[in-house]
Amino acid sequence: ASLVGSEMCIRDRLYTVGIQQNYQPTQPIAFSHKIHAGQYEIDCNYCHTGVNISKSANIPSVNICMNCHNAIETDKPEIKKILTAYEENKPIEWVRVHNLPDLSYFNHAQHVKVGGIECETCHGPIKEMDVVYQYSELTMGWCINCHRETEVNSKGNEYYDKLVALHGKNSKNPLKVQDIGGLECSKCHY
C-alpha cells in the first residue's frame, strides 16, 4: 500500500510541475495596476501595445511610461527610476510574470481581438492589483476547459456569423471554441 501511495504522491506532484499560479516576483520598479488601470482607468492596450496585433501583449517600454511621467509625479522615487532609465537609454528589466512552456503557442491577438476575450479572463482582477501576480494556473487543462466552455464570439466577424448560423441548424447547443478546432493539439503545440 505504501508503494501505491508513493506512486500517487509522485504522480500528483508531476501534475503541478511548472505551475506558477500566484507567482508574484519583485519588479525593478514598484508599479501598481490598481492605480493605473483601476483608479485612472488607463486601458490595457495603452501600455500593452501588442495585445490586438501580436502573439505577445508586449511589456511596456520606458517610452510608454514617459508619455505621462515626463511631467507627472517626477519627484517620486519609483518615477525617478523610470527617468534614469530614460536618460541613460536603458530598458527597464521587468520580470516576466506569466510564463508558458516553450512547447506551447499562445497568441494574444487571436484570443483578445478575434475571440473577444477580456484581459481579466486570464489575468484576473488586474485593476485591483497593487503588485501583479499570476492569477490563473495557465495549465493545459485550464486552457482546454476554457475552450470547452467558451462560446464562439462572432461579433464583427462575418465568417463566424455564418459558422454560428450553420451550427444552429444542426445543434441546440451554442457553438463552442472546441467545435471549431479549439482542442486540436497543433493549435497550441508546435
Labelled PLM ranges:
Residues 1, 21-25, 75-79:
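Short, mixed-charge, low-aromatic patches
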Residues 26-75, 109-190:
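Sequence context surrounding c-type heme c attachment/ligation sites in exported
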